[in-house]
Amino acid sequence: MSIQLLDKTRKINRLLNDKHSSKVAFADICFVLGQMLLANAYIISSKGKLLGTYVNDDGMIPSFQSKQGSYIETMLNERFLNVLSTKENVNLETLGFSKEERQGVEALITPISIGGERLGTLFLCRCQKAFSIEDIILSEYSTTVVGLEIMRSIQEESDIEQHKKSNFSSALTTLTPLEQKAVSYVFHAMGGEDGTLVTSKLAGKIG
């Protein structure tokens, strides 16, 4: 491993060791990667959502949606997901981009997977410079970091949802049978087509 590559991986490591945050921002990873490789960097979820972006050259691929939080086209995301191992210096026409857009643009696609589960894609592109072996190593190292962060986020959301359900169940146990029945009617009414609650009707139904 060259000294330059070692320095670059250490910059990624610093994001993991940031004491000011308990989580790694995908945008920060894109920023660091993009600046080191002089490339546009995009982290895309398996559903096609742009979790993080860094644009080094906003005129490189005009038709590509690059706003963080937005979704890329379904067909494009499917093409990304069909890439099962790192592909360097990809012809953009194979992804559905026009011949004009691919002129002089080199792309690097690295799957984001943990434990055999596909979580997303890292997409890097830049003008007039092919991606090297060291660039590939750095991208694959970065996708490991991103994959672990995605898994952590999924687990965190699951824990929050489970906590909400637990609190709701605990709250129900403090109610009388009649109150529990009333709550049941309320939630049933909230799921109605008009989305409104009529308390007099509820009172009549509950008795």
Task: Report each predicted region and the residues it spans.
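Short secondary-structure transition/capping segments
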Residues: T86-G96, S139, G195-G207
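Structured interaction and signal-relay segments at domain junctions
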Residues: S2-K11, K19-Q103
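Signal-transducing coiled-coil/dimerization helices and immediately adjacent hinge/linker segments
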Residues: R152-G207
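A short beta-strand signature within small-molecule sensing/ligand-binding domains used
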Residues: E101-I112
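Juxtadomain coupling helices with adjacent low-complexity linkers
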Residues: S2-N17, S22-K23, I29, Q68-G69, ...
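Short hydrophobic/glycine-rich mini-motifs in sensory/regulatory modules
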Residues: I112-L122
